[in-house]
UniProtKB/Swiss-Prot annotation:
The chain crosses the membrane at residues 55-75, 80-100, 185-205, 208-228, 243-263. Residues 30-44 have a biased composition (Low complexity). This is Vacuolar iron transporter cccA. It comes from Arthroderma benhamiae (strain ATCC MYA-4681 / CBS 112371). The gene is cccA. It is a multi-pass membrane protein. Keywords: Ion transport, Iron, Iron transport, Membrane, Transmembrane, Transmembrane helix, Transport, Vacuole. Belongs to the CCC1 family. One of its GO terms (cellular component) is vacuolar membrane. Its main location: membrane.
Length: 279
């Protein structure tokens, strides 16, 4: 079936190996040593969802508040820029945080609904469940006998069967219990930190036009660095292609931020050409 030297394996052996995280058959001593050394040398990795939320929050924070502060600077009053910018920062951070929380809660609810439907399917339709298991193994062109035995083992273990269907058929992973709050806080902080950077010159310089120039210079550098880092986090840091892609990502962020700021300034000047008080 699976080779002569494995013909003495019992169903219990197959069941244990089916859920082994690193392979179907027991590793050799050399493989075990290599696996142990690779695991011990692996550094802890940041949750990809946290990285994604941080990038999203910073990306919006570096663009929208900068465009708003640049537009408000056309009014010629640094106090208006600071107050309006801070108000937008707080409102935007709260909005981003709530959006992240609601989105994560929706993922949890979707996962729980999938779990309920799968449990009902297992209890109500044994034959359909067995067919689904065979569908999962079908792309691998495995012999029928081991697939049938594995299906039987899975069906006799409800918890493992549920986990198998969720992972390999529905392709769903259980969300973290605190993921909604972590996502909300990460998005809100990313937005606030990113949006506060272009406001810094307005706290230090009294002349609005000078502060605007400082803000533009700071944001060009910040957007360039952020775009480069954001791209290289996804693609990698080494290699000519990755470096070129990182530079392109930085330039794209500068172009997007510049267009948003330019549109905001143009709109403010169109509404208030003199730069005086509106009311």
């Amino acid at each position: 079936m699976l080779g002569g030297r494995h013909s003495h394996w019992s169903p219990q052996d197959l069941e244990e190996q089916a859920f082994s995280p690193y392979g179907t058959f027991p590793p050799s001593p050399t493989e075990s040593t290599e696996t142990s050394s690779s695991i011990s040398s692996t550094r802890p990795r940041v949750n990809p969802r946290i990285v994604s939320d941080a990038i999203l929050g910073l990306s919006d924070g570096l663009t929208v508040p900068f465009a708003l502060s640049a537009g408000l600077s056309a009014l010629g009053n640094s106090r208006v820029v600071v107050v309006g910018g801070l108000a937008e920062l707080v409102a935007g951070a709260i909005s981003m945080g709530l959006g992240g929380y609601v989105g994560s809660r929706s993922e949890v609810e979707s996962y729980e609904a999938t779990v309920r439907e799968t449990k009902h399917l297992v209890k109500a339709s044994p034959m359909e469940t067995m067919n689904i298991i065979h569908q999962v193994f079908a792309p691998y062109n495995l012999p029928e006998e081991p697939v049938a035995r594995m299906s039987h083992i899975l069906y006799n273990s409800p918890e493992k069967l549920l986990d198998f269907l969720l992972t390999f058929y529905h392709k769903e992973s259980k969300p973290g219990c605190h993921q909604a709050w972590i996502s909300a806080i990460t998005l809100a902080l990313g937005y606030f930190i990113g949006g506060f950077i272009p406001l810094i010159p307005y706290f230090m310089v009294d002349q609005v036009l000078v502060a605007l120039y400082y803000s533009i210079g700071i944001m060009i550098f910040t957007l360039l660095v952020f775009g480069y880092v954001k791209t290289c986090v996804v693609r990698g840091w080494t290699g000519k292609e990755n470096i070129v892609a990182g530079i392109k990502g930085g330039l794209q962020m500068v172009v997007v931020g510049g267009l948003a700021a330019g549109a905001s300034i143009a709109l403010a000047r169109a509404i208030n050409p003199t730069g005086g008080a509106l009311f």
